[in-house]
Each structure stands twice: as structure tokens, then as C-alpha cells.
């Protein structure tokens, strides 16, 4: 397969699959409470439910790892490809999160708060769903690109 097509196809496919994970976000958050819950499910639930600050922390760790010298026998460009894919996947996850929120918007607007008054979802939350993670990983991607070229 053409490497350029592969670079486009893999993140999109992974993003779609992980977008489905976002659709079951509440289900994933409930899973870690089970005593027999596997550790990888706990990790996945933690990543999916992470706040913007936590995602930024993860991104900083990834940038630090990417900036370190390559392991013997593993060229640095291989690490660059991994982070290229990871950045795209996380961006698509955020997009999927925003789309799921948009699809549920009419139902969300109809809910009533504890005081009995109708609730509403602010537009800022929708914007955050679409742009939060891609922005974080675009920034980290820039750091990685600088490290690769220096």
C-alpha cells in the first residue's frame, strides 16, 4: 500500500474505532468499579475520561519521549511515524466526541436540573469537543518536528 495512503487510512480507521469508544464513555467509566475489571480497561477508561489538563500532561510525556535519542536499531523517523498516527487518532477521537455530543444535543437541551429549571449545554463545550485534543497534539507534533530536524 502507498505509504501516504497508509498514513491517512490508519489514523482514520483507528479514529473511527476509538470514536465508538467515546460513544460508550459512560459505560467505560462504570467498568473500573467492577472487582474483576482488567487493568487495560481501567487504563482505557482513564484515557477516554481524561480532562484537557490530563491530556496535555500525556502529550508532554509523549513529546519528552519523542525528543530522546532513538533506541539502537530503531531509527528516529519510526518514532515520528508513531506520534504522527497517535496525534491523528487523538484528533479524530476529539472530533468523534464532538459529533456524539452534537447528535445528542436535542436530548441534552431537554433535561431539567435539580432546581427543576431546564438545562442547556454551552456552545463552548461543543467547540471544546471538536478542537481540544487536535490542538494539544498539533502543538506536541510541532515540538517533535523541531526535535527531529535539529
Predicted feature descriptions by range:
Residues 1-150:
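Hydrophobic, small-residue-rich transmembrane alpha-helices and their short perimembrane loops
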Amino acid at each position: 500500500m502507498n505509504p501516504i495512503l497508509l498514513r491517512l487510512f490508519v489514523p482514520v480507521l483507528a479514529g473511527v474505532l476509538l470514536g465508538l469508544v467515546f460513544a460508550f464513555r459512560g459505560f467505560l467509566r462504570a467498568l473500573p468499579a467492577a472487582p474483576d475489571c482488567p487493568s487495560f480497561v481501567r487504563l482505557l477508561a482513564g484515557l477516554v475520561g481524561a480532562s484537557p489538563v490530563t491530556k496535555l500532561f500525556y502529550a508532554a510525556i509523549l513529546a519528552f519521549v519523542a525528543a530522546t535519542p532513538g533506541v539502537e536499531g530503531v531509527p528516529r523517523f519510526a518514532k515520528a511515524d508513531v506520534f504522527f498516527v497517535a496525534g491523528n487518532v487523538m484528533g479524530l477521537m476529539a472530533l468523534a466526541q464532538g459529533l456524539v455530543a452534537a447528535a445528542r444535543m436535542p436530548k441534552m437541551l431537554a433535561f431539567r436540573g435539580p432546581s427543576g429549571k431546564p438545562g442547556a449545554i454551552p456552545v463552548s463545550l461543543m467547540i471544546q469537543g471538536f478542537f481540544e485534543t487536535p490542538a494539544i497534539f498539533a502543538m506536541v507534533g510541532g515540538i517533535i518536528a523541531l526535535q527531529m530536524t535539529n
